[in-house]
Each structure stands twice: as structure tokens, then as C-alpha cells.
């Protein structure tokens, strides 16, 4: 029986088809993780494991959760965050906290919210709070968005949002490479229906009005489009955080400086191998590796230390054996982050399912990335939602925990935040905008178009699309994703479920807890190879 990508789910194997394989459930995984790592001294001496040093507890709680669940406080929050002429009160509250020049009228008006900030900001000094929150445009936008969301929908795990926290904007279809796995199926020329500069600037204005704190520019290759600089400058005017995902081949020192002046502080450059020939063959152009590595050096040499680069690698069967070398290269090139991209068979990668990792390979990879994150040698990002589960299970209480699209942070409070914003954010806390203005839940779900920015507001598109309720409800899942102990922190990759089963609510067959479903795919489709679980144990 053939099971092409996007077709219906394969029938279950008959019990006598193959020897029974030992599968792992999330409950067993959690129990095993609790006693996973004793330090070397305790292990050597045989000293008992102290429960205060536990590594996993999926029921973290913070007093702020009680406040946010109170209907009276939600009403107060709604009043603070409501949009009005001059902007929401909450924006003014955040921007004026700790300001010695604040008028007595404003001191009285904002006494209660300022008191709450003092109560919940912990050991952060007033000056530090002003620098990192009140005077940081993206944080203010994000907090207003979150406050409006809690006021409207209540506190929910995962949290529903009135507007996306992140927009990934595939700025143009044009690209100068021909990557074998391109999710966008990018071309060497622009498409005739791409947004005009006027439409692009208007879209930024609308995103700011909806309190969208971050826009990530991708493509195609966004740096080929001359409209990118004026659009970046408009984002900077509104306080929107911007990043550029690029192949790096155009990023000369002069271009890096121009984008940095326009407000970009993070560049994410794709590099698939430490072997130049291997990378160039995959990317379809000789010399690509050399130019990308030089671009990473150009960014590292920029005089502003806040301008940084991440090395992004899509890990497949073709470069799984290079993971350690890629990490070392990222560190040697002074990157601030190593970014793992989950392989998803869409776009030009649609016929490459045999290159996908097995669940056990992916689990090994994520555990290795967690170890790297805890070492703090370099930041770690992953588009695999299972990374949040891995951090929760194998990081110490004060260790780094991934909150999916929002990065990672340390400590118990980070685990509370991850409960609400962690895991797959497709169509829930982030959305994709295509070069022509079409909107989809995720860059890896290009066929799930739910509207166009030329016709409707961002809020209407985001909350009114046919996938929103489904993607916000993790009880509506198939396979182990429905009952998983970690579903608040993961939820499975909806794009992978959609690519393999044609169903955004399907199980993610790349997860260790759905390994039986992966085995069924392998057995049902000869195209999906079953490679050895190299280094995956």
C-alpha cells in the first residue's frame, strides 16, 4: 500500500506482521526523566537523589496565574490594554514606571498597576525594568497584545491571542539559490502579484496597530528585494522587532551595516554542512558555502555587539552525522545561536520524506541540543516543538527552557511561561504572510490559505480563519499528541501532521511517543526509508 505525503492515514498493522516493538509513552518518559541526571559525585558515591533537585514537574505554578484567572482583574486588565486615542493606558504604565519626572496626576492614575509591577518584577531594579521593558518597543507591544488576549479569552493553556506575537513574512518569491528542500519552492524571479511597497508599508502600520511585536523576514531571499530597507525602517519607527532569515550570499559588510541601521539585530543564516561541496550541491550553487560563512564573519565583525547571527541548519539523514561539527562551526564563527530546523516534507522537499529523521534520531538530537543550551556556550533554537518537552524533562529547575517561537529562558518562571506560549504556535501565536499577501498558519503549510491582507484586517484574518479553534485546542489531536503529558509545552508539529496525514489535527509522526505511527508509515510506503538510528540509542 502506498502512502504519499498528504494522503489519508495508513491502516494499522496486523499484530502478526512484525515482532512487537517496545514503544515509549510520555508518562514513562516523564518518570524516567525525573531520575535522569545525578551529578558525577552522587553517581560515584551512590548518594541518594535529592527531590529538591528534581528535573521534571509539569505542574509549575506562579501567583500571577491566580491574578490573571480572576475575572475582576481580567476586567481591569482589559481596561488598561484597551486601544484608545493616544494608545492604551498599559503602554503608558510600562513606559512611565520608575520615571522620577512622572507628574503627580499620573502617579495617582497609575498607582495600582505600578504597585503590581513592583510586586511581580522580582529582583529586577527599576532602572533595569525601564531599559528591558518600558523603553523596549517590542516588549511593550507584546505585553499589550498579551494583556488584551487574557482579558478577552481568559488564561488558557495554550494561550489564545488576539493577534500574532510573530509574523513570518515571506517577503519575496525571488531567490538566487535552488535549495533541494525549499518549503517555499522559491524561484529566480519575483512573482507578478507580490505586494507593492505602498502595500508593504501599510501592512507594517496595521501590524503595529494590532500590537504585533515581531516580524521575521524570510523568502525566497528577502535581501534581493529593494523594498526591504524602507519596510525595515517603518518597523523600527513602530518599535517592532525585526529579524532576517537569509542564505547570506548577499550580506557584505556594507549591507549588514545598512540593515543594522534599519533596526535589524538578528540575522539567521542557513548552512547545511561543514563540507563546502556538500552544502553547495544541496543549495544548487557553487561558492554558496564560502559566501555564507563570510557573511557570518561580517556580522560577527559589526561594531555593534547587539547585532548578532544565528547559524540555521535543517537536520536530515543527509547531515545528521554532522551535528557536532555544525555546532562547533557556529561557536567558532561567534554565532549567538545554533538553530535547528525541523525537516517538513513540503515545497520542493515534498518528495524527500526518505530524508526525514526517525523519532529516535530526533529525540537524540533534541537531547543533545538541550545539553548545549544548559551549557550556555551558545543559544539554541529549534522549530521542533518537542524541544520544549525535552528541556522540561532534562533541564534542572533553574536551567534553560524553550518557549518555542519566543526563544528560551532560565528558571521556574520560564516553565510557567512555556506552559502558555510553548510548543507549536502555528495559527495560534504566529502566522505566515506570503509575498502576495496570502495568509497561512505556518510557512510549512502553504496550501492552508485563509485569506489575504489586501482584503481583511490582521485580527480578522488571524482569529477568523477556519483553523484557529482547532490549532488553539490541543485536546483535538490524534495519536499520543491527544493524551501526552507534555502537550501544553509541545502539542506536536501541526505542519508535519498535515504533511504526512493531510490533517492539521493529526499526530506528529516524528515524536518518540508516536513511534508506532512512524513505523506504520515506513511499512506502508517504500519511499519513506527506515535508516538506522545513528547515535540515537
List the predicted regions and their residue ranges.
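C-terminal accessory region of radical SAM enzymes
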Residues: 2, 302, 359-415, 438-491, ...
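Radical SAM/AdoMet-radical enzyme domain recognition
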Residues: 197-358
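Conserved alpha-helical substructure of the radical SAM core
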Residues: 87-258, 262, 266, 357-358
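Short Fe-S-cluster ligation motifs
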Residues: 203-219, 472-473, 508-537
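Short, acidic, Ser/Thr-enriched surface-loop or helix-capping motifs
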Residues: 433-434
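Short, small/polar residue-rich loop motifs at catalytic or cofactor-binding pockets
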Residues: 424-428
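Iron-sulfur (Fe-S) cluster-binding segments and ferredoxin-like electron-carrier domains
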Residues: 184-193, 446-451, 487-521
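Flexible, acidic/Gly-rich N-terminal and inter-domain linker regions that tether
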Residues: 2-165, 536-537
Amino acid at each position: 500500500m502506498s502512502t504519499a505525503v498528504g494522503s489519508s492515514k495508513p491502516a494499522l498493522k496486523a499484530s502478526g506482521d512484525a515482532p512487537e516493538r517496545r514503544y515509549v509513552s510520555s508518562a514513562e518518559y516523564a518518570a524516567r526523566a525525573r531520575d535522569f541526571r545525578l551529578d558525577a559525585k552522587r553517581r560515584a558515591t551512590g548518594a541518594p537523589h535529592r527531590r529538591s533537585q528534581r528535573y521534571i514537574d509539569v505542574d509549575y505554578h506562579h501567583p500571577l496565574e491566580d491574578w490573571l484567572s480572576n475575572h475582576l482583574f481580567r476586567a481591569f486588565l482589559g481596561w488598561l490594554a484597551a486601544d484608545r486615542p493616544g494608545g492604551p493606558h498599559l503602554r503608558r504604565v510600562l513606559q512611565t514606571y520608575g520615571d522620577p519626572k512622572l507628574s503627580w496626576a499620573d502617579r495617582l492614575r497609575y498607582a495600582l498597576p505600578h504597585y503590581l509591577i513592583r510586586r511581580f518584577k522580582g529582583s529586577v531594579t527599576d532602572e533595569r525594568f525601564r531599559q528591558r521593558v518600558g523603553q523596549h518597543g517590542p516588549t511593550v507591544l507584546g505585553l499589550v497584545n498579551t494583556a488584551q488576549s487574557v482579558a478577552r479569552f481568559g488564561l488558557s493553556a495554550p494561550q489564545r491571542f488576539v493577534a500574532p506575537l510573530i509574523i513570518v513574512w515571506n517577503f519575496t518569491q525571488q531567490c538566487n539559490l535552488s535549495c533541494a528542500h525549499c518549503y517555499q519552492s522559491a524561484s529566480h524571479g519575483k512573482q507578478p502579484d507580490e505586494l507593492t511597497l505602498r502595500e508593504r508599508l501599510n501592512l507594517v502600520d496595521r501590524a503595529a496597530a494590532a500590537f504585533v511585536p515581531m516580524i521575521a523576514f524570510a523568502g525566497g531571499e528577502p535581501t534581493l528585494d529593494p523594498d526591504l530597507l524602507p519596510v525595515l525602517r517603518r518597523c523600527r519607527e513602530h518599535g517592532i522587532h525585526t529579524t532576517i532569515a537569509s542564505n547570506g550570499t548577499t550580506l557584505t559588510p556594507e549591507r549588514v551595516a545598512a540593515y543594522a541601521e534599519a533596526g535589524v539585530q538578528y540575522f539567521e543564516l542557513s548552512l547545511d554542512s561543514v563540507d563546502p561541496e556538500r552544502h553547495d550541491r544541496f543549495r544548487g550553487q557553487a561558492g554558496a558555502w564560502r559566501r555564507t560563512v563570510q557573511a557570518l564573519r561580517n556580522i560577527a565583525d559589526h561594531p555593534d555587539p547587539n547585532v548578532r547571527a544565528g547559524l540555521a541548519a535543517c537536520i536530515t539523514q543527509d547531515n545528521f552525522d554532522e551535528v557536532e561539527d555544525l555546532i562547533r562551526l557556529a561557536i567558532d564563527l561567534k554565532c549567538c545561536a545554533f538553530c535547528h530546523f525541523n525537516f517538513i516534507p513540503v515545497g520542493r522537499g515534498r518528495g524527500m520524506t526518505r530524508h526525514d529523521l526517525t523519532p529516535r534520531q530526533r529525540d537524540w538530537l533534541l537531547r543533545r541540543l538541550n545539553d548545549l543550551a544548559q551549557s550556555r556556550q551558545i543559544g539554541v533554537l529549534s522549530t521542533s516543538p518537542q524541544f520544549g518537552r525535552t528541556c522540561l524533562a532534562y533541564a534542572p529547575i533553574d536551567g534553560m527552557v524553550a518557549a518555542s517561537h519566543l526563544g528560551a529562558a532560565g528558571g521556574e518562571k520560564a516553565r510557567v511561561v512555556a506552559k502558555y506560549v510553548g510548543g507549536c504556535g502555528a495559527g495560534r501565536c504566529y502566522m505566515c504572510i506570503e509575498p502576495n499577501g496570502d495568509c497561512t498558519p505556518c510557512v510549512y503549510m502553504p496550501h492552508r490559505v485563509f485569506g489575504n491582507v489586501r482584503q481583511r484586517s490582521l485580527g480578522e484574518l488571524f482569529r477568523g480563519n477556519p483553523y484557529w479553534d482547532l490549532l488553539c485546542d490541543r485536546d483535538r489531536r490524534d495519536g499520543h499528541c491527544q493524551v501526552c503529558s507534555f502537550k501544553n509545552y509541545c502539542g506536536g508539529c501541526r505542519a508535519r501532521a498535515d504533511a504526512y496525514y493531510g490533517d492539521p489535527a493529526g499526530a506528529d509522526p516524528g515524536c518518540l511517543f508516536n513511534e508506532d505511527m512512524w513505523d506504520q508509515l515506513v511499512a506502508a510506503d517504500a519511499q519513506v526509508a527506515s535508516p538506522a538510528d545513528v547515535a540515537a540509542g
